[in-house]
Amino acid sequence: MDDEGAPLSESAQVVDPDVRAHVYSLVTALGGFNGENADRYVLGDDALACLRDIKRWLKLHDEKNNRMDVARCLGEANLVNGDLLPILTLWSTSGQNSKFMSRIALACLELLVPLTWPLELHSEMTVNHHRHTPYLQQAQVLYKRGILGPGGSSLLRTIIRIGLPSMAVPRSDRTTRDEGILKLMLYLLRNIAVISPHSRLSAEGDEEETSRSATINAFQDQDAFALLLTMCSNVADDFNLQDVVLLEILFHIVKGVNVEKLFMNDTQRKAKRTEELGDLLQKESSLRREYAKNAPTRHGRFGTMIWVKRDDAKVSTVSGQDVLKDSQTTLYKMDQSKKWNKPQVRRRQTEVTVNNDFNTPVNLNSTATKNLRIFIEEFLDSGFNPLFTHVRKAIEREADRIMDINSRHYFYTVAWFLEAERVRRKYQRERHSQEDKSLKKMEPDSFALVASVLNQETFVFLNRSMQKSFDNKEVEDLTAEMRCFTQILLTVQEMAQSPLDDDQEVADNIQNRIFYEETTHDRIISIIRGYKDQGFGYLDACTQLAHVFLRMLEHYSKENVDMQIRSRRRIKRKAKQDDQAIDVEDEEHASEDEELMEAERVSKERKFDFKRFAAKFCNQKCVDTFVAFIKYYKELNTDQLKRAHRYFYRIAFKQEMSVLLFRLDIINLFYRMIKGPGALDSSKPIFKEWEELVRQILRRMIKKIDQRPALITELLFSKINSTVFYLEFGFEKQTISVSKRPPAELEVDPREAKTTDEKLSIVVRVMIKDEHINLVKWISEVLRLAADERESWESREQQPGEPTAPNPMIPVKPDDEACQKAMFSNAKLRLLMTLIGFERLGMEDVPGASWVVPSSFTSDDLRHTKRVIDQCLIEPATEDPDQDLSRLIRRKYANDARGGGRDEQNLDIDFGSDSEGEDNVPDGPLFPPNHRSKANALDQLKKQRQKRRKEDGDRETPDDEVLEERRRARLENALARQAKIKSDLYIHASDEESDEEADEEFFRLEEQRRKEQAARIKHALLHGVVEEISDKSSKKTGRKRQSDQHTTLNIDAHTKRQRRKNRTDKLDEGDDLVMAGTEAQSPDSPGLGSSSHDAKGIENTPLTSDEDELEFDDDLAFSRDRNRRKDFTPNVDKMVIEPAQQDADPAAPDEDDDEDAPVVGSSRRRVRGGFVIESDSE
């Protein structure tokens, strides 16, 4: 092998001799023209094996080693034109019925595709690639020349015939071999369309035979266009894997073709060419006139050199006879002799894709124009929608066959065909008008032929691709996408003018969708502002897009006054911590509550203002983009000149921002466009518009210089917003600074620090750790000065006879501006001042707010606080690795749920709780069920008694059926009594009135009942005997249950609501005879209404009337005291069980009680934590 690093000399071998010998031997063995008939190609004995060996050499040597040696040898051996093409001709004429010859033809096709594969210059090329690429490019041009078939050969038709059998097979029945044959056929057509004579290489006189016109004519004559139409129209059904190759073929056929010339007839095309020739002659005459002004005379054969004396007494040397004309010419030539070594900017290395360049125009002859127009019209009618729908879906799902370049092919081809559809409609209307046919009689065509690229899916794909290309600075892709977007807008604009209602409705819907997103507006503005030497194609595309978008949006906003757009902006959301509240420099030790400010996009609709949107184009970057575009004014056509004219007119007169154009280079450019040298052609209509525009701009500039002499200096520079405002209005723009929000309020965790001194120590040590020791020292100094001032005031106040002023508040004065800013922005400093007791004056928390030491602080208080702070400054904090002091400082919430506390305003309001064990419900429920607190306590005692009896064997526990029957009877009885409750018991008109006599009567009865009960309990404890309640009193009490009900209701009606609550609660707790809790006892029959108070009486606690407001849970009281007092209260059970026996069976309340008779406790359900607990032991 040759050394790639060695320089190429005469002795250097381009290709390894062994490789060349093997390849030449295979080509020789393939066959040749030797024989009786010199015009007939004769195959060798092992022709098929030779073709396969050559393919194997290409694959294993060139592709595997990334070289081009075998391809170079095959080109030198003339394999394509000398062997492969004759073999294909032989097969097409006589060997189509031979299976062997069909295999030979397919093998030839397999070699033609890699040998004609387009060559691109890229960054990964090796020395071997650079050595062989120029030769292979010339060889490929010769391959194309031979395939296109000069002299009437039909090799393209022959190649298509190879793939026809595979096309005829249904897609479901095709094998991998069939798909491969179709791919080979299409790739060869693609290669033929791509290959073109290289501009840097010698053409050898075959430009016309390999030009775009020759390719189009060959495709038309040899049925390649018919093949493409068939496959495009059926791409979704039969050729779904060939969509990308079809797109590439279309791209390389139509790229660079002028659509306007394509649809012209011969007369129009001839007139257009004549006009172009006239323009060229006019430019030549203009150049000659400019040259004649400074042309040398007949005496100019001698050299000329002069000295130019400048103002600073220096002399410069200028040569040439043209400097003798005048001093201005002399100075101009001297300026031209100066050279500016402009610094080279390191740009991003971009791939050179010559074959995919669509900005270079291509000229077609008349025959090729006619053939291409026929194909384009048929493709628009049948294949446009299926192909582009299928390709877009494949690109969106990133199919394996998709490459990065295919997205560019897609957008450019869509743009080209949309423009072709609009131009075709335009010339159709012109032809109908020339044929004296009314436009009304002509049936309008619908835009459904191109509907596949006018749907929402395409718009989403286009916007996403534009944003991606703009972000990644992919210039060529973005150029194709801008062209596509522009043509979509122009197509929609024409749809809006269609006579068909459906087209108008669809156009309005599309415009609404496009203009609704503000991100689309912002993207276009960013593209215009972001131009920087991306090339003329990019410049042309972005200026056209801005021009069309701005005009259509202006028109649409005028028709839709209430137009709404969706605006997306970034807002900052603070989750749990404020950036200004806590210093998060050390993220490892940050509190769990700290979170960084995160940004999210929110969408909201707002009314669209076109003036506001158009003003975004009024900046120096947009102006510079159009100025860079207009610098090519000599090469621009009328539409492009009009585009730039409309923009500058909008800037100067519609937006009243002509100051942006007052720059020397811009003014000089405008002047040269009108006055020369190299001015616009004055015979063109656009010249007059530009002339008037430039005149008005210069007039405004001169007038503005008279008003603002500072503009003379500003002519040298670009204008920023503040400069533009000053030059327009004569004064600086007044800006109002928006005040910042105060940081979040902090607090020290009260669980870690109880006293104020501890909290102060924590805050001070955290500030010292955060390197804010200067602020701590400043606070200490403020406290010292305040203590001295307060001490002097206190000493004056103690002197007798001297009137003293009231205790004044002492202002907290910051040392410098940084300290003043920290008083607002430093959350820990604000926490420290708050803990000390400093107060902020005023209601607004804004920067610069005043803080004062309140008058309530004494000098001793201030000195004590200062000592605490100074102690923290003197003694360094002990580093505890397990505890970070900064974690003890947290954000203070308005309603801190972590502490379980309530608002300070609601501390005195008891809302009650549903938690277990709490029966304190404000005002009680509206219709409460029977209270079970007393009964539950009795049940507990009964169960204990039953347990003792069971242990003694006195009695067995009743079965479950008896217990269930008794429980059901009790429940029915309780529900019946509850249903009798009337609302008058709880709500009465007299509740808002006061009755002192009723109050005194109520308290007297309560006091009497409490004393009697306390006396009975004391007697029972002292003597061990329970005072029995006779049958008479029991029956009497039973009778009073009915007779005293009316009295109880009257008493309740004359009391206040809160007092009624206390009384009824105590009656419910104490009266075991009234199960429903709605009847009061009379003084003659005291019950157990104050059992909880009696429990206190057991411990000899004196009872007062104030204890009447206390509320006890009887269950809680009994369970708490029962076990503790079991030893010294043996007869308590008798006292409690007697009335409980009456309540054991509510169905028979009048039955006489027998103390000695066995008693069965009622089976009551136990409730624990809201759950009913059933026990089998009951």
Curated annotation (Swiss-Prot):
Residues 580-596, 911-921, 1105-1116, 1148-1157 have a biased composition (Acidic residues). Residues 576-596, 792-811, 896-965, 980-1178 are annotated as: Disordered. GO terms for biological process: DNA repair; DNA replication checkpoint signaling; meiotic cell cycle; replication fork arrest. The keyword Transcription does not apply. It is found in: Nucleus. The lineage of its organism: Eukaryota, Fungi, Dikarya, Ascomycota, Pezizomycotina. Pfam families: TIMELESS (PF04821). Belongs to the timeless family. Residues 1138-1147 have a biased composition (Low complexity). One of its GO terms (cellular component) is replication fork protection complex. It comes from the Eukaryota. Residues 896-905, 981-991, 1001-1015, 1025-1034, 1117-1128 have a biased composition (Basic and acidic residues). This is Topoisomerase 1-associated factor 1. Forms a fork protection complex (FPC) with csm3 and which is required for chromosome segregation during meiosis and DNA damage repair. FPC coordinates leading and lagging strand synthesis and moves with the replication fork. FPC stabilizes replication forks in a configuration that is recognized by replication checkpoint sensors. Component of the fork protection complex (FPC) consisting of tof1 and csm3. The keyword Cell cycle applies. GO terms for molecular function: DNA binding. Residues 1079-1092 have a biased composition (Polar residues). Keywords: Cell cycle, DNA damage, DNA repair, DNA replication inhibitor, Meiosis, Nucleus.
